[in-house]
Amino acid sequence: MLKKNNKRKIFCSALVLGSFGFLAASFVSIIYVITKNKIQYQEQRYKNIIFNHIVPSNLHDNDIQRSCLILNNKLLGDKKNHYLWLAKKKQDITAVIFETIAPDGYSGIIKMVISLDIKNGKILGVRVLSHNETPGLGDKIDVNISNWITKFSGVKIFSLDERDLSLKKYGGNIDQFTGATITPLAVVNSIKRTIVLVKMLLSSKFSELTSCDNYE
């Protein structure tokens, strides 16, 4: 009889613990979904703000974030998949936005987006999405800190050996930062690699790339 009572107590305890575990797991899952959706919403909102700064409204009439493609090319800084977005006017592609990284920043990876006018081949804008560069030195790549990154707007790049689009220290026209050369050099080189890739893609079809919807 005593053994039966002990078994019953063990069973009840296990049942209670299992129920609490299930409820806890369910609660965590619900919080995860809510948090994930909120994060995704904030990311989309942030990208909309960025896109509005680097692609003029008169160049597109589509929802740029919905015209998303996946591209994998080492010129984008690594071997991972990157996003690119197409700006369209009356279904014609007018500009393209590339997600790219500078893997060789002073304090690690610098994540950026670069937009290019398809018609004239000029850079429309560049913005840094995230970085870990030194405050007061390398963080001048952030448009909220200085206007340095805006000086690439209107620039046209023809090759990776573009002399003018180099730091003044190396005979170019781009200002380096006082006490910080590695950061701006990493950004400049990343921009050149990305634009060269864009020009390569213009000779092919963007439709051959995978849609973000299909990828996800």
Curated annotation (Swiss-Prot):
Its cofactor is FMN. Its main location: membrane. The modification FMN phosphoryl threonine is found at T181. GO terms for cellular component: plasma membrane. Part of a membrane-bound complex that couples electron transfer with translocation of ions across the membrane. The complex is composed of six subunits: RnfA, RnfB, RnfC, RnfD, RnfE and RnfG. This is Ion-translocating oxidoreductase complex subunit G.
